[in-house]
Amino acid sequence: MDLRKLLGRMASMAVAMALPLIGQAQTFPTKPVRLVVPQAGGTGNDVLARALAEKLSQAWKQPVVVENKPGANGTLAISYVLGQPADGYTLFFAGVSNLSFNPYLYPKLPYQPAKDLTGVAMLANSPFVFVASPSLHVQTLQDFVRLAKARPGEISFASGGIGNSTHLAMELVAERTGITMQHVPFNGTGGSTSLMNGQTPVMMNVVAGVQPFIAGKKLVPLAVTGDRRLAALPSVPTFKELGYDVQVPGWYAIVARAGTPPAVVQQINADINHIQDDPQFKEKLGFQFLDAIKGPPSEVERYMKRDADAWGPVI
């Protein structure tokens, strides 16, 4: 057999071997896909998840249905996902607390993130802003720290739930500023309501969760996380500027049950990365003050491990 025929046969064999994988990827999805969100409807996470679901539905020509299952810092939602087939038809909208913090918060956690879940795609990251109710009569972080030290343990703070990023962020603020506060956890949007009426007068939240209230003078921004000031809040200093090391991860990712076919994972990853270049989706990220994160599925594991290693000792 001459070299030309041999190379031709080898090329044919390579194509034949690749066809099953291509076919598998091209035939997904053939039915509706569920995107499970561990927060209530109307929250910032829910808004982002629905924006993504809309674009995936358009790309796949199949409905992507958002299902809200709040509670236990995502544990209920993840348990539900793990009870479904590992086929890519049930995806989980994860935050850093679900994947990196929960193993340290719950001794009997019913799942192991690195073992039971597989990364699909990173989505975005958000800075946090520390806000206060006008009823507290503080205008700067220094004002608040002085007040809290004069009233140790009297001031309460709201969060999105025990172990939520908003909870741990405030615990970090308390530790770094040398103050003590009472924690009042909420599910869904109750924390913002309690914050504005002064019942729990301070909170740390992603910018999108409080920006409308800041603009409406219903909340006072005191400091932001990150290395630089935010374009949306140029007059608000960073914790770093004020001498406090308060860095809080606020990323979101899509994960699936471990064992999901790699070809399906790769297709979903490629489609989400493509959606992040969509002008309408980028605009929606901008409305929520989110920075897109793109990369292969392995990026999810990298972020998850990085923040588990960093925050485990703190927790």
Region locations from a protein language model:
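N-terminal (or domain-start) structured segment
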Residues: 25-115, 154, 162, 177-204, ...
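A ligand-binding cleft/hinge motif common to bilobed small-molecule-binding domains
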Residues: 98-108, 171-176, 202-234, 312
